[in-house]
UniProtKB/Swiss-Prot annotation:
InterPro entries: LOB. Belongs to the LOB domain-containing protein family. This is LOB domain-containing protein 28. Residues 11-112 form the LOB domain. PROSITE patterns: LOB. It comes from Arabidopsis thaliana (Mouse-ear cress). Transmembrane segments: none annotated. Pfam families: LOB (PF03195).
């Protein structure tokens, strides 16, 4: 531990090395610009100035300082590579790429929309009156409804109609059965049995 502290004091940070001064333990640049990042500090010093950088470090929360210094170093390097535009050149380039991608996306969406074919609805053939009579549960086409949806009263009327139709059919069947039974009984009384075993 003692060796590490002595090595830290004996090796100046990039800022103190650039300024040719002794690096102390309370140096604000040492944690963020070690001797291995001399190029970064020189770029930051050239663009922003040492006093402004020191003021910025002291004004920030300790947990924000490292990220802020990395950002300044990146901006300074970009400014050194493109003195005219700096960071704005990268921003404009990214915005141009976004615009190109949005235009390409719109073209692709239009092409996909041209392949989407909406199927045409073909209504089923209407039933004849005879077919509707044979199927009492079928709702007649002329039945008024609200946009194709039956109301509760209409459903009740249709149920009553179906019940009355079924009742009429059952009564008609019973009458036919009674009539046939009556005919058979009359024939028996008139002609008697074919054979008399007594």
């Amino acid at each position: 531990m003692m060796f590490h502290q002595m090595d830290k004091i004996s090796t100046p940070c990039a800022a103190c090395k650039h300024l040719r001064r002794k690096c102390t333990e309370d140096c604000v640049f040492a944690p963020y610009f070690p001797s291995t990042k001399l190029d970064n500090y020189e770029a930051v010093h050239k663009v922003f100035g040492a006093s402004h950088v020191a003021t910025l470090i002291n004004s920030l929360h300790p947990c924000q300082r490292e990220f802020a210094m990395d950002t300044l170093a990146w901006e300074a390097q970009v400014q050194a590579n493109d003195p005219v535009n700096g960071c704005l050149g990268i921003i404009y380039n990214l915005l141009s790429q976004i615009k190109d991608l949005e235009e390409q996306l719109a073209i692709v969406k239009n092409e996909l929309a041209s392949y989407c074919i909406v199927p045409t609805f073909v209504p089923p053939p209407s039933m004849t009156n005879l077919e509707m009579h044979n199927n009492p549960m079928m709702i007649p086409e002329h039945t008024p409804n609200n946009g194709g949806c039956l109301t509760g009263q209409q459903l009740y009327n249709e149920a009553q109609r179906f019940a009355s139709t079924q009742s009429a059919q059952m009564q008609e069947t019973q009458m036919q059965h009674d009539e046939e039974s009556y005919r058979d009984k009359s024939s028996y009384q008139k002609f008697g049995p074919c054979f008399n075993l007594h």
